[in-house]
Amino acid sequence: MLIIVACQFIAPKVGVASPLILLVVGLAIGFLPQVEAIEIEPHIILEVVLPPLLFSAAVRMPTMDFRREMQAVAMLAIPLVFLSAFAVGFVINWLVPAISLPWGVALGAVLSPTDAVAISIAKRSGVSHRIITVLEGEGLFNDATSLVLLSAAMSAGLAADEHALNPGLLIGKVAIALGIAAGIGWVVGEVGVRLRALIKEPSADTVFSFAMPFIASVPAEHLGGSGLVAAVVAGLVVSRRRAAMISAANRRFSQQNWQTMTLVLESGIFLTMGLQAFGIVEETAAFSGGLAFAAFLAVALGALIMIIRAVFIAIMLAWLDHRRTHRQRRYEVENSRIARFEKRMNAACEVDADMLQARDLSPEHWENALNHYRRRLKRRARRNAMRGSDLDYFENEPLGPREGSVIVWAGMRGAITLAAAQTISTHAPMRALLLSIALFIAAGALVIQGLTLPGLIRIVKPKMATGDISEEERAKLLTVMGSALVDTALAQAIHEVDGQTLLSAGVSRTLSRMGHAVSADDEAAGMRIARTADRILTDILQDATTPDAASASETDDDARTTVDMSEEEVERSFTRDQIRELALEAIHAQRDALLQARDEGIFSSAALEGALARLDNEEILLVSSHGVDN
């Protein structure tokens, strides 16, 4: 633990990712004469460490962005893994005939999954959010694909049957494993998040969340599915449902504890990777050719994997661009269809009673039919609006050659490669050589690619994350959050009591919170946004005022819908519990509005996460103050 803390402390000072430092520290300790060869059971990493790590990453993944990048993620996680594995298998079988094709494919499957350390390095370099989403999505699923392929290849190798590597059979096995895992993960996620909604104690909720990845992965493995995919799917379900169903206090508490657990597990993986290196190297040195031959094969196969990845990603980006053009045309065609549908609906609304009578239709039946088509029109319009939001996202976050080069170079291998390699059967020919190749490629990729990735980003200059929310998006957020207040009891209270007095009396923090929810760090910008929030909220509440009240306010100041009250009078009008309930209702209404906007893809995930986090802060503050008052 102290080593992890020390590496975390040193990493930002030397400008190197902490996993790389931990790997070097592990290598240094492992090669000390006083330290014997260390071997850790690989199933501990694959079945105990990886499920919670992938579950945690899936929970942090914005589901809106994952949906948008699902095609790219699927291509990187399945076809690329198959291509890389079979290419490695054929090449090593050609270079080392003693290693049959099935065992070569097994090594290829081991070398296929990318490592999460690349994501932390890319994030720190400030690349666009879309690049991070693609890398994270690939890392969530390619582990499972490679492990399923590894199992099939080892079975073929033990049976000495190369025909068992028929691509059709392998694709079928992968599809079945993924299908079983997705079903179990979805059920565990849906049931688990509902159970967590019933748990009021944050500590108990966090403990239950720690168990969820294993509740998903263990049954999936026993039923022939992928336990890792089950944990990922459960995490994605939690990511989508938690804001609406789990209390803010529970979510915040579990998030902080998961960050600590993730740090310990990830750091432990890289430290143990370095510690195990000496034993693998010592075993390989006993074979003819020894380490030099293993290093040569590692360089050749590592270069082959990167070339395949570069070519595949270039083709994928061209295909994605073609798909974007096709979506644009489809969006425009659907827009014109919706416009024609609306014209026909407007004409249908003007049908008179004589025409209905001539067609033997009652007004009630006609109105029911119109309502049915209105609902259809609304659904089509929402789907097309989502398509338009996706197109805006693709335009603002492009994936061109510059971004593609970052995705290619960030595909480094790591601790998962070494753990998977150690599961290769002891009956495999030249097993020590296979393990050494995996070690050299994983360690070499982490060090070489990990250290040079920031430099590559500076050279190719891909689209970078701005970190700021545009004024237009802030205004739209404020409008959505303000509109959500119209039907709440808080809005009624604001009409009955002067809103400014409510603010100054501290009776309601909701109005000022609207500005803070999307405010910038700059104080001047924050004040400007707060004034915008006040103006937008005033307009919304005035629009919600009844026409009678509005006309009365124009003719008689005494008939206004709000009244002047002193702070003392306001505080006598509302108890603290009433104030708290008004504010909590407003928070829930605004959160629901933001989640609906998320489903429609209206805002960026960064803007939504910031606004939702501010609402969580306010809810936690209100709930905790209630406990203090009592």
Where are the regions a protein language model picked out?
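Cytosolic C-terminal regulatory domains/tails of membrane transporters and channels
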Residues: 366-377, 461-630
